[in-house]
Amino acid sequence: MGRSLATTLFVLVLGLGFAADDLSAQTLPSRAAPGAVFLSERAMAHILARHGPESHAAGAGKFAPGMTTPDIRALIAEAVHAGIRRADTDGRPDALYDDRFARPIGTTIQGRPTPRLRVVVAPDGAVITAYPR
């Protein structure tokens, strides 16, 4: 299976790699994570359903109108690679990656424009969710 143009551009722009022939789980580089971080199609589906530009879910930050799935994947990859990593709260074993971009990427729960993104990563390296905050 060949890479799509969007995938090729994504790899060239951010210098990221994908599993050989499987784009269902995208490996993301992280300078802070002890192991590989990956974004599954299931996690991406959750992110789009709850936080995507078309989502009507209440009580959730949303990505900006017009953002595509590749755009959101690129933001997540950048946050995991360059964001600040810290432990999750209340004893949860997950890691939180917080990053601030040069422009608004979406809206907060309150509906205000925000340049900030949080990515939640499980101990096994699986991205659980990502949302503007």
Question: Locations of the language-model features?
Answer:
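Functional cores of ribonucleases/endoribonucleases
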Residues: L28-R133
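Positively charged n-region of N-terminal signal peptides that target proteins for export
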Residues: M1-S4
